[in-house]
């Protein structure tokens, strides 16, 4: 049975549009690294995608090298050990620190790391579970979407034009937004998430902005 917090998430995003069962080996592997509440959601819900790929719960193993690259030479590299637990359809990575929880989001499209200073503290197991519950309960669809140059949310329009995102796909912009590209539908392409985020991470050191 779902708890109220994940229920709020489902009320906002709807049921999963893509479902991936999490193997028990993955749950066992991450027991000592991620909160029990997150592993419970993995077991009962899965590594699912919602809203045709607008937000996905992900396997941290798939993003370890990308997270390491984006955090390299930042204050966060040595402050905690971070793992990706969620991804947006435009390549934002939601991170969970083993000690401090969910306080970083890497916005790869905008070359920015958003840092929640108020949530940056070492947490007990109980606090870590509450942190995960709060993370999901407080998500909103608009927080993962991007407004185009006319202030119109663009994700659903991209899905209409290019189709839903597959498991390893994101929508990217050509040229990249932080290189001067326009935020418009015609600039969007479906891209392999790993290749795209790796390429974006090689241009310049990301900005750090307090959320």
Range-by-range predicted roles:
Residues 1-104, 164-211:
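A surface-exposed partner-binding patch
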Residues 2, 121, 125, 145-152, ...:
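Intrinsic-disorder-associated interaction segments
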Residues 104-145:
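Compact, glycine/acidic-enriched structural inserts
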Residues 130-184:
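Mixed-charge (acidic/basic) macromolecular-recognition segments
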């Amino acid at each position: 049975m779902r708890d109220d917090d994940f229920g709020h998430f489902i009320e906002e995003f709807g049921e999963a549009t893509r479902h991936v069962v999490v193997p028990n080996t993955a749950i066992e592997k991450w027991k000592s690294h991620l909160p029990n509440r997150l592993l419970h959601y993995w077991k009962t819900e899965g590594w699912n995608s919602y809203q045709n790929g607008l937000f996905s719960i992900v396997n941290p193993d798939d993003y370890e090298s990308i997270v390491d690259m984006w955090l390299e030479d930042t204050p966060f590299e040595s402050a905690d050990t971070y793992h990706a637990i969620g991804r947006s359809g435009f390549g934002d990575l939601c991170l969970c620190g083993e000690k401090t929880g969910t306080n970083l989001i890497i916005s790869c499209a905008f070359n920015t790391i958003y840092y929640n200073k108020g949530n940056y503290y070492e947490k007990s197991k109980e606090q870590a579970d509450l942190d995960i519950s709060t993370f999901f309960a407080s998500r909103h669809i608009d927080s993962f979407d991007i407004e185009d140059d006319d202030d119109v949310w663009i994700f659903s329009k991209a899905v209409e034009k290019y189709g839903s995102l597959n498991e390893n796909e994101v929508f990217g912009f050509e040229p990249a937004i932080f290189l001067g590209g326009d935020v418009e539908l015609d600039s969007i392409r479906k891209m392999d998430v790993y290749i795209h985020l790796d390429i974006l991470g090689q241009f310049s050191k990301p900005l750090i902005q307090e959320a």
